[in-house]
């Protein structure tokens, strides 16, 4: 057996829907709500639709004129819908940042209070199927009890449909609430509605309670009762007290433009303080933004750099290396003077347009660290003298501590500084070979040769000092050859006076125990010196290869410094 319901009287009665909305609102707020919902749930719209449910009688227990009791199987697949409004708490530090790009986000750091967002939910496309126990009585109304969970599915449409995880969460939460509603609250709501329809006493008692509630609430407060101190209109013009008094809630004047000028300035400053590129950045209450703290952090770092200070690029760092290292003292002084102009910006070389290194390999620069030629060097090369008279008196020797070699400071961060401008000349390999040969001759022979007699005494002294300082790199390792103590005492080279700052070592103790060894060594040294002298001077008294010896007597011109 089946029943056909006439749904038209329910749709025609406007009071029925109003009362049903109030009952549903009270039922939804009565049950424990999830913590995300921070406001009351209000039913704003209710419509049962035009399709009634289907009931199938399974059992009839009691049947009379004023009462009925039976068990039914109910199924519903209609067009009823329900609209709810509430406020939910959102987390601005998580949901807002996920849905916004980084350049348009105010970047909140912390929130002291929760953010409440209005939420509108529409429930539609109900699918119900279950067993219902129905009891009807004119004195007690209608009682409906579900033996199982009737809710199969429904559609939830909300404000957050564009956010997938919020939509899924609301779907699950509302389905859980509706299951509890059908099992507990819906039978009570149906019972109260039936009492209002069939029991007049209950209807009168309920109307009296509603009237007393309206009287206790009283009239609403007028927000214009206390106007601001300096009101302005929408154009920013100040308003007189008479114009403010003429305004009312029902007038056509724009009430929303009536704000204090101080409040407008504060709101403008608050909007500008977020410092984002988005034109519609929402304001979140009790939230600290990163842009607010960044201004104080940048304040300290701005004091270190000046906006007017120039920034050198990578191309400008090669200016110091454009000068060629010519053996000229004026050129080198100009080089050091030109490079000192960049001493103030040495730390800013990496802060130009190219902060990252390029893939191109850096070129290695070969810097000529040799001292430029002077007239003193030319004299030393020709063999007349190794040191000039000025250098011998004023220049520091190799035995003293290094002094300030130049007053000019080379602060070029790219080109390394030149070698100290010593007045002490480093002899070439040929000079040191000639000096070592002369030393062997003086050491092995008691009578000086013709070439040694021709040289001045100052040249011999200088040659001896250089021979002691720079040993011959081409000398063949031999046994120790030392002069006897008597010859060493008479030798003027060994008694040369050294400066006071020189590090003097005690002379080695000669080994005089074997006279035969000394005689053999003296004979070998004299023979070697004689052969070398005969090779230089031919049998006829002239050199056999004058061009060869002249070329080796002159100092070789050092090659120019390599470019970069």
Swiss-Prot record:
Component of the ER-mitochondria encounter structure (ERMES) or MDM complex, composed of mmm1, mdm10, mdm12 and mdm34. Residues 351-365 have a biased composition (Basic residues). HAMAP family: Mdm34. It comes from the Eukaryota. It is found in: Mitochondrion outer membrane. The keyword Membrane applies. Belongs to the MDM34 family. Residues 1-208 form the SMP-LTD domain. It comes from Talaromyces stipitatus (strain ATCC 10500 / CBS 375.48 / QM 6759 / NRRL 1006) (Penicillium stipitatum). Residues 208-240, 336-397, 404-423, 434-517, 532-564 are annotated as: Disordered. One of its GO terms (molecular function) is lipid binding. It is a multi-pass membrane protein. The gene is mdm34. Lacks alpha-helical transmembrane segments, suggesting that it resides in the membrane via beta-sheet conformations similar to those predicted for other outer membrane proteins and porin. The SMP-LTD domain is a barrel-like domain that can bind various types of glycerophospholipids in its interior and mediate their transfer between two adjacent bilayers. This is Mitochondrial distribution and morphology protein 34. Keywords: Lipid transport, Lipid-binding, Membrane, Mitochondrion, Mitochondrion outer membrane, Transmembrane, Transmembrane beta strand, Transport. Residues 380-390 have a biased composition (Low complexity). Residues 366-376 have a biased composition (Basic and acidic residues). Residues 209-219, 438-462, 477-503 have a biased composition (Polar residues). One of its GO terms (cellular component) is ERMES complex. GO terms for biological process: mitochondrial genome maintenance; mitochondrion-endoplasmic reticulum membrane tethering; phospholipid transport. InterPro entries: Mdm34, SMP_LBD. Its main location: mitochondrion. Component of the ERMES/MDM complex, which serves as a molecular tether to connect the endoplasmic reticulum (ER) and mitochondria. Components of this complex are involved in the control of mitochondrial shape and protein biogenesis, and function in nonvesicular lipid trafficking between the ER and mitochondria. Mdm34 is required for the interaction of the ER-resident membrane protein mmm1 and the outer mitochondrial membrane-resident beta-barrel protein mdm10.
């Amino acid at each position: 057996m089946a029943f056909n319901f006439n749904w038209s009287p329910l749709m025609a009665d406007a009071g029925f829907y109003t009362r049903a909305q109030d009952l549903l609102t009270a039922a939804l707020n009565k049950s424990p709500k999830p913590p995300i919902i921070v406001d009351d749930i209000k039913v704003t719209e209710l419509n049962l639709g035009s399709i009634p449910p289907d009931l199938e009688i399974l059992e009839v227990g009691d049947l009379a004129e004023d009462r009925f009791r039976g068990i039914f199987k109910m199924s519903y697949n209609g067009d009823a819908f329900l609209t709810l409004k509430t406020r939910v708490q959102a987390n601005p530090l998580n949901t807002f940042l996920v849905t916004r790009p980084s350049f348009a986000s105010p970047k909140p750091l912390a929130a002291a209070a929760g953010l409440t967002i209005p939420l509108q939910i529409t429930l539609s496309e109900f699918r119900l199927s279950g067993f219902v126990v129905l009891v009807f009585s004119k004195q007690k109304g209608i009682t409906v009890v579900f033996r199982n969970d009737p809710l199969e599915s429904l559609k939830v449409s909300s404000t957050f449909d564009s956010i997938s995880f919020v939509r899924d969460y609301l779907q699950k939460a509302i389905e859980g609430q509706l299951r509890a509603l059908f099992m507990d609250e819906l039978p009570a709501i149906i019972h109260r509605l039936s009492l209002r329809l069939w029991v007049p006493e209950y209807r009168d008692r309920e109307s009296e309670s509603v009237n007393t509630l309206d009287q206790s609430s009283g009239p609403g407060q007028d927000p214009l009762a206390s106007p601001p101190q300096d009101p302005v209109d929408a154009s920013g013009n100040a308003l007189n007290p008479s114009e403010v008094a003429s305004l009312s809630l029902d007038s056509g004047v724009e009430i929303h433009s009536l704000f204090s000028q101080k409040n407008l300035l504060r709101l403008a400053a608050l909007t500008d303080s977020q410092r984002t590129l988005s034109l519609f950045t929402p304001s979140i209450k009790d939230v600290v933004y990163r842009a607010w703290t960044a201004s104080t952090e940048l304040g300290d770092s701005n004091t270190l750099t000046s906006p007017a200070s120039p920034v050198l690029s990578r191309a400008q760092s090669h200016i110091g290396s454009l000068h060629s290292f010519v053996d000229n003292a004026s050129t080198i002084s100009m080089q050091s003077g030109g490079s000192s102009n960049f001493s103030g910006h040495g730390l800013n070389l990496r802060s130009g347009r190219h902060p990252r290194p390029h893939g191109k390999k850096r070129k290695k620069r070969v810097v000529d660290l040799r001292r430029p030629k002077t007239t003193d060097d030319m004299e030393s090369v020709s063999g007349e003298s190794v040191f000039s008279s000025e250098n011998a008196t004023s220049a520091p020797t190799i035995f003293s501590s290094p002094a300030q070699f130049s007053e000019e400071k080379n602060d070029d961060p790219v080109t390394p500084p030149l070698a100290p401008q010593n007045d002490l000349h480093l002899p070439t390999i040929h000079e040191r070979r000639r000096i070592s040969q002369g030393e062997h001759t003086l050491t092995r022979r008691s009578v000086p040769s013709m070439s040694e007699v021709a040289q001045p005494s100052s040249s011999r002294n200088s040659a001896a000092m250089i021979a002691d300082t720079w040993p011959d790199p081409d000398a063949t390792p031999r046994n120790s050859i030392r002069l006897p103590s008597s010859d060493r005492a008479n030798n003027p080279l060994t008694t040369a006076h050294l400066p006071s700052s020189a590090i003097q070592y005690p002379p080695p103790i000669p080994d005089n125990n074997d006279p035969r060894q000394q005689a053999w060594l003296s004979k070998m040294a004299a023979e070697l010196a004689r052969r070398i002298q005969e090779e230089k001077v031919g049998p006829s008294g002239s050199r056999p290869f004058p061009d060869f010896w002249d070329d080796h007597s002159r100092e070789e011109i050092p090659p120019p410094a390599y470019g970069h």
